[in-house]
């Protein structure tokens, strides 16, 4: 089967049920199925064929999801673009994977129109008055004709989604995910969340990342649930939706949770409809987990990446407090290994690189054989994350392999120090990086963002660690910032932090 059959099936079973609830308008499953059908026909009339690419630049919207399912019907590739990127970055991605059709929401039209000459073979679609050389969304839909028959060549093995990695270092890579990867990911999500047609999902994460698209949104539509979709995250709008829409499930990354907890409204908000909140994308501070549990809502962690669609492991709600801080066990249709530098499995409790295998893992990186070969070996995806498993098989993520600090020959994992400092009620954010040092090779630097209204000094920060970790792990320097640089999904850009620390050191020495 191909993924648009999910929508058709529920349109047949409950045509009037709300599939997507968006500000000021709802789409029933029948209406969503009709839009997908019309859009697929219009795209086909515009030259989109099997393996063609369709790109979309805009905030979360029903049209964005409909485009994904229309591409699934045609066997085409859907490429959602990160609206936080600058024009030259979008130009780079569109050159890496040239689309046949590019949908652009109003706020971003000028940005794309600035390099329109480089998109001569692309049908450019605007949602309001189109510039010269563009067409309107309505004009595109008018190209639709007869229903598009299902193509027997389109199935689970057919590539569907190109999601570019966050690009925390170097050139972003496009992870190529098949229709089967999204389908198996939905099965994993349904198991974790016990998803059913009765659920009401709130999506605030951007759909241009697998975290927003596939943690709950596409799984919810596969289950016939209702997705309450926000264009982008706003803390107060999130509170409103949870209370007024009686939301049962949502995904919030730690940075979003921090913003909500900082609001006075957090203490009294009605969260009684929530069965759980799912989080991930970065290591989750234990104080954050405790605070959400204090409000009576299980906070469950997912482990995964763009390349795993993303769900590879998770903690079930029953274990959320007992295993606070763990990324859980392997999802039902995934396997995990922890391997040492020799490629052999390490013993429980020992740290090694996390490997993932399963039908939800990407096919390859688009247009990058070398990078694909480096991470896909013998059927396993090498995540680049370091972690260990306890005696019960629960995964604990220790940090990125490339972020490990080697000081005086000793291996130091930043996540250990970050977790300890993150417990402090005076610290909002922390990132630990290495700085080059003539004597030790590298030394530890803690970059700290104090909680608003709090005053900290280096001595206070170091005191939080004294006696809790080996002395060689203690930061040799503490840097204070107002905020940390982050990706769209809330991951700290460690390369930017390292560069900032290096510049500071250089300025002090000159």
Curated annotation (Swiss-Prot):
Belongs to the ATP-dependent AMP-binding enzyme family. Involved in degradation of indoleacetate, the most common member of the auxin class of plant hormones. Highly specific indoleacetate-CoA ligase which catalyzes the ATP-dependent activation of indoleacetate (IAA) to indoleacetyl-CoA. Also activates some closely related compounds such as the non-physiological compound (2-naphthyl)acetate and phenylacetate, which seems to be a fortuitous substrate for IaaB. This is Indoleacetate--CoA ligase. Keywords: ATP-binding, Ligase, Nucleotide-binding. GO terms for biological process: fatty acid metabolic process. InterPro entries: AMP-bd_C, AMP-bd_C_sf, AMP-binding_CS, AMP-dep_synth/lig_dom, ANL_N_sf. GO terms for molecular function: ATP binding; medium-chain fatty acid-CoA ligase activity. It catalyses: (indol-3-yl)acetate + ATP + CoA = (indol-3-yl)acetyl-CoA + AMP + diphosphate; (indol-3-yl)acetate + ATP + H(+) = (indol-3-yl)acetyl-AMP + diphosphate; (indol-3-yl)acetyl-AMP + CoA = (indol-3-yl)acetyl-CoA + AMP + H(+). The lineage of its organism: Bacteria, Pseudomonadati, Pseudomonadota, Betaproteobacteria, Rhodocyclales. Inhibited by high concentrations of substrates, and by the synthetic auxin compound 2,4-dichlorophenoxyacetate (2,4-D), which does not serve as substrate. Its EC number is 6.2.1.75. It comes from Aromatoleum aromaticum (strain DSM 19018 / LMG 30748 / EbN1) (Azoarcus sp. (strain EbN1)). The keyword Signal does not apply.
